[in-house]
């Protein structure tokens, strides 16, 4: 039987000589407003927001497995409430203390109130959770317990790396999926520590940042929307925004995930690799009206969620049953505190915001022109050096690619993904679109003080086909998700080249391999910031599943045999990354202006048709020559001297289904350059640059077989290196 104590009474954790009001009066005002359970010198301060609660309690537990609390402490509404903030100091408690909140109040769904006095509630400001969701025969769900954490850690001088966004190469990975396979050979598979063991691989690949799929705490099974009772492998149904996922800890000790995540970040930073978090700040795992109550819904539903004005039903812009009321001052404050927490406590370098357009919506779901939350994040001084990347759309039709927020924000460029896929698939009239994407997507980002690096270029992401499957399947194959193959996107711009799925056919395998190399080459030779998905460098497959959100198995896991079996593609990818990192011409800080080399000057970009003449964008020709002129010394200086040796770039692309004869551009400026082959997808593997420069003549054609790419580079006299 739990012991219930009022805060004005003595209790087992320490004898009070002061009233609760006197205790709170001794604390700095900022401490009172620091929500959550905070360690103090001689106890723990609990702070929680609720506007309409009539009573609040903190339930204290001894172990994560406890069904009933060891003690229940009631807040005194007369002395422990400051406006809508409830706060109580309990002496004698210390870090490691487990707790829930419990709140009394009205249940009136039409008015937005869903208080349940029996519900055990996770603290929205929990810094860590312990235990699992417990299901009782009566249908009640008990969530994990919140933990008062010990925040001490020896960072050994670690600081944020602050790589320039324009120089960033992102690698998207799932903490568990990266090392869960037995083939990983790590001591701690599927964990933060497992990632540490694979840092040499990341370092050899050459990426500068890892973008981690959600690591904030989430239930292992989904309670949201139509996906209820499915495995929540991806983690896009959060329950505690501030808390690292305990399932990724190698230790079962409560709170140990805090230390292990810090160890991982410290180790990645030591390898000069930044850490970007994919944060889901648009909904929670509490689902819709018939979903469970285990946190915000039971504390202040009417504030935290977007609700229909007449019925109190949940607005569903996330596709997951509910939507955070992100621009309400209380919710906005929580989100900003959350981001600061990750930056300050874990040294996180940046964030990718899932369904970021939701963060621009007001309580009625209307898109703000100047959303208060976005402005708060943009102007937050602690986030000033933090990378901000928006997935600039949502599940209700908002699409803000190219128009999201301000110059502080980069964006996942969905147009880049679609246009590159369509060009190399051979769709009609895609050459102009390819050129626009190669040059940094000025059609999307040339305004609002933006530059090419505001475009995060990707061809695949966790959400959709892998690169291998993009050239192996015409349709999605999500039967393993048990949703009758109704989930996942139907519009993938994929092509199997004759046989659906895997094949031993050598000719077909060669075509698919070439198309993968074509798209990888395009990605790393484009202006903007490239993002590679873990495994695309070595033919990882999901067997045609383009929505593997619930597949915690070999469908999703990284198979560590692949880098060995497909070492040629891995080395090809490493070469592309090395070429990009060594050549500032591919990492321009400003948009290209164009020009003509026939005038005797070197333009920053020039476009040619296969016959060597200037391109006719309306011809429907599926082949293209692109010239990127190297930046001048003055331009490099103005761009803060990016690392590497600037080289001119000449790119030949042939998406046609037959061989094409390309004439070298006749401009003397281009002809006289000392060209060497840098990338050649005509071969079955990457061609290393020739030892001696190659001489080309305008009258001698360059032959490109069907669906192939050739990239030449020529040196200048300017060398920069940081």
Regions found by a protein language model. Give the residues of each.
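Short, flexible loop/turn elements at secondary-structure junctions
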Residues: 50-52, 79, 92-94, 105, ...
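Substrate-binding/active-site clefts of carbohydrate-active enzymes
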Residues: 174-193, 197-348, 355-382, 398, ...
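Conserved alpha/beta catalytic core and glycan-binding cleft of carbohydrate-active enzymes
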Residues: 126, 347, 360-363, 368-534, ...
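Short catalytic/ligand-binding loop motif for oxyanion handling, primarily in non-cytosolic enzymes
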Residues: 108-112, 179-181, 218-222, 283-286, ...
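Short, solvent-exposed loop/turn segments at the edges of secondary structure
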Residues: 83, 96, 166-168, 234-239, ...
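Core domains of carbohydrate- and sulfate-ester-processing enzymes
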Residues: 103-158, 220-237, 271, 291-315, ...
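Hydrophobic faces of well-ordered beta-strands that scaffold small-molecule active sites
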Residues: 169-171, 210, 275-277, 351, ...
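Carbohydrate-interacting/catalytic domains
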Residues: 1-171, 176, 197, 202, ...
């Amino acid at each position: 039987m739990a012991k219930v104590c009022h805060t004005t009474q003595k209790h087992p954790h320490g004898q009070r000589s002061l009233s609760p009001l006197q205790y709170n009066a001794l604390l700095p005002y900022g401490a009172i407003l620091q929500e959550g359970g905070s360690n103090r010198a001689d106890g723990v301060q609990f702070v929680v927001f609720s506007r309409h609660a009539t009573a609040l309690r903190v339930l204290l537990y001894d172990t994560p497995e406890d069904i009933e609390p060891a003690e229940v402490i009631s807040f005194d509404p007369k002395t422990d409430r400051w406006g809508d903030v409830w706060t109580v100091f309990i002496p004698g408690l210390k870090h490691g203390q487990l707790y829930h909140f419990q709140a009394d109040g009205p249940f009136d769904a039409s008015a937005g109130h869903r208080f349940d006095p029996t519900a055990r509630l996770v603290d929205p400001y929990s810094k860590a959770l312990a235990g699992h969701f417990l299901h009782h025969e009566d249908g009640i769900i008990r969530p994990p317990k919140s933990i008062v954490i010990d925040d001490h850690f020896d960072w050994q001088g670690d600081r944020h790396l602050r790589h320039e966004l324009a120089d960033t190469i992102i690698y998207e990975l799932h903490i568990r999926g990266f090392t869960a396979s037995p083939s990983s050979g790590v001591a701690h598979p599927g964990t933060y520590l497992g990632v540490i063991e694979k840092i040499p691989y990341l370092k050899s690949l050459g990426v500068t940042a890892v973008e981690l799929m959600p690591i904030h705490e989430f239930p292992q099974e989904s309670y949201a929307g139509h996906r209820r009772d499915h495995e929540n492998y991806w983690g896009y149904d959060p329950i505690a925004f501030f808390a690292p996922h305990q399932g990724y800890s190698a230790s079962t000790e409560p709170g140990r995930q805090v230390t292990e995540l810090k160890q991982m970040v410290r180790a990645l930073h030591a390898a000069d690799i930044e850490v970007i978090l994919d944060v889901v700040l648009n909904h929670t795992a509490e689902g819709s009206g018939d979903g469970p109550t285990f946190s915000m819904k039971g504390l202040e539903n009417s504030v935290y969620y977007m609700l229909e004005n007449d019925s109190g039903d949940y607005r569903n812009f996330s596709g997951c049953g509910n939507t955070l009321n992100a621009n309400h001052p209380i919710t906005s404050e929580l989100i900003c505190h959350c981001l600061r927490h990750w930056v300050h406590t874990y040294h996180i370098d940046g964030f990718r915001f899932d369904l970021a357009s939701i963060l621009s919506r007001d309580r009625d779901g209307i898109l703000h022109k100047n959303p208060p939350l976005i402005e708060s994040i943009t102007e937050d001084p602690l986030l000033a050096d933090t990378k901000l990347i928006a997935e600039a759309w949502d599940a209700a039709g908002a699409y803000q690619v190219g128009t999201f927020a301000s110059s502080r924000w980069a964006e996942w460029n969905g147009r880049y993904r679609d246009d590159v896929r369509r060009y190399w698939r051979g769709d009609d009239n895609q050459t102009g679109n390819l050129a626009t994407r190669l040059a940094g997507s000025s059609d999307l980002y040339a305004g609002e003080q933006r530059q090419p690096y505001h475009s995060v270029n990707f061809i695949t992401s966790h959400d959709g086909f892998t690169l291998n499957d993009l050239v192996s399947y015409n349709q999605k194959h999500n039967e393993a998700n048990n949703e009758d193959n109704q989930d996942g996107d139907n519009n993938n711009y994929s092509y199997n080249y004759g046989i659906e799925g895997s094949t031993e056919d050598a000719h077909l395998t060669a075509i698919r391999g070439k198309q993968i190399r074509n798209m990888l080459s395009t990605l790393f030779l484009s202006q903007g910031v490239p993002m590679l998905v873990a495994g695309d460098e070595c033919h990882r497959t999901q067997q045609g599943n383009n929505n593997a959100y619930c597949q915690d198995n070999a469908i999703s896991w990284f198979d560590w045999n692949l880098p060995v079996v497909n070492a040629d593609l891995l080395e090809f990818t490493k070469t592309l990354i090395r070429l990009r990192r060594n050549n500032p011409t591919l990492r321009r800080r400003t948009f290209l202006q164009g020009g003509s080399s026939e005038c005797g000057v070197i333009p920053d970009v020039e476009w040619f048709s296969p016959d060597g003449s200037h391109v006719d964008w309306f011809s429907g020709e599926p082949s293209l020559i692109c010239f990127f002129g190297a930046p001048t010394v003055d331009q490099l200086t103005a761009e803060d001297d990016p690392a590497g040796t600037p080289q001119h770039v000449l790119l030949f692309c042939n998406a046609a289904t037959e061989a094409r004869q390309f004439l070298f551009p006749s401009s003397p400026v281009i002809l006289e350059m000392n060209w060497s082959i840098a990338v050649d997808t005509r071969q079955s593997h990457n061609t290393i640059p020739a030892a001696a420069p190659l001489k080309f003549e305008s009258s001698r054609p360059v032959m490109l077989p069907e669906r192939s790419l050739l990239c030449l580079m020529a040196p200048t006299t300017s060398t920069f290196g940081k």
